[in-house]
Amino acid sequence: MKKLYIALTAALLSATIQIQAQDTTKKEIDDKYVENDVVSLAGKKGFSFSTKAGDFLFKPYALVQASATYNRYDDQGLESHYAKNVANSGFAIPNAILGFTGKAFNKVTFNLSLNPAKSGGALLQQAWFDIAIKESFRIRAGKFKTPFMHAYLSTLGETLFPVLPYSATQSILLPYDLNYVIPSMSTGFDLGVMVHGLVNNKWEYQVGIFNGTGIDVNTATKTNCDDHEWLPSLLYSGRLAFMPKGEMPNSQGSPENLNDDKMSIAVSASYNAEAEFLSASDARVGLEFTWIKNRWYFAAEGYFMNMHFTKIMQKPDKNFWGAYAQAGYFITPKLQGALKYDVFDRNATDDGGLLNMPAVGMNYYFFNNNLKLQVMYQYMGRTGHATQGDRDEDGIGIARHMATAMLQFTF
């Protein structure tokens, strides 16, 4: 195993050197690198401060979401038999983000954002700086999105639905306890360092090392693995995307851009070494396809996770997978219709049974597109389970009927 990791590291370093050799032109960074993963700033001057020379830029931004949600659960979908069928319903503030982004010295971009709608370590949503050695070789350090999954890498304020696919965000089911939070398919925000770049305006690569503890932890808490003492128990993640029509925007459809034609095909992989406090290691792989064509947006994505338990646990491996396809179309320049079909093997492949979750939605934009109304309805069905008990357990904590309306304001 140790020889395998050494070989992979050598191959990665070799690939990075080759990528750098393809792009030797020195170029000052431009405003397209001034990004925040919250709201799109492409082509928008807005409210900003800059020097006359343009080598320093400072842009504040904000995103506020207010939602109303109705969730109705089956009796079998409730964690307690005494709970009411209608639960987790009412009004909420999913996100209330205030941040600033910018550039300095024509080499460094930066971003800092706070989210008071969250608690604990998640109050600090992002804090990073990015050094652009050249377009094909950039280094980012701090707290930011890990390079895995189109659903998460999309700009937060430009998603097709107000809720991300459940196959990406809901935790898996295990027949035994862990020493840590049970994982989901996604890896989300984390603390770490990443090398990334764009080559020939068609190839994008991202390779990083992270804590693997997620958005809620802002401190160093990791150690070395038990089974492989030479390996730090961190998250190792990478993504490679091919964009045949040029650089792909992170939007899932925008009224600002109804005449574009962009496509992306990407593969990603991550290894969270003994992530659950030395209980299990999570290996994830993903494949994604996205296409924006004029008023159309289409995405299809699948992901697989293997949980390998440590020797002390004495448990067999468990495998899980999920996938979704979604499409959006601007019926008018301000009105976007949306459809999604989401599938989740939540209880592991050896148990059988799937959750299938179709959804329909609509987005409407007001006031120069700074105000956005999103509505959606999702149904949770189950199929292929061996017993009624398996069927009941697979849907625990997930509403049979979910309806959400959300207003979002950005600047």
Name what the model sees in each region.
Residues 3, 19-65, 411:
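N-terminal periplasmic/intermembrane-space "pro-region" immediately following the signal or transit peptide
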Residues 46-73, 78-215, 232-247, 326-338, ...:
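Outer membrane beta-barrel
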Residues 68-74, 118-122, 147-151, 213-217, ...:
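Gram-negative outer-membrane beta-barrel proteins
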Residues 95, 124-126, 190-192, 233-237, ...:
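Transmembrane beta-barrel architecture of outer membranes
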Residues 235-247, 362, 366, 371, ...:
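Outer-membrane beta-barrel "beta-signal"
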Residues 239-347:
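Detector for outer-membrane/organellar transmembrane beta-barrel domains
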Residues 326-328, 334-367, 372-382:
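Outer membrane beta-barrel transmembrane domains
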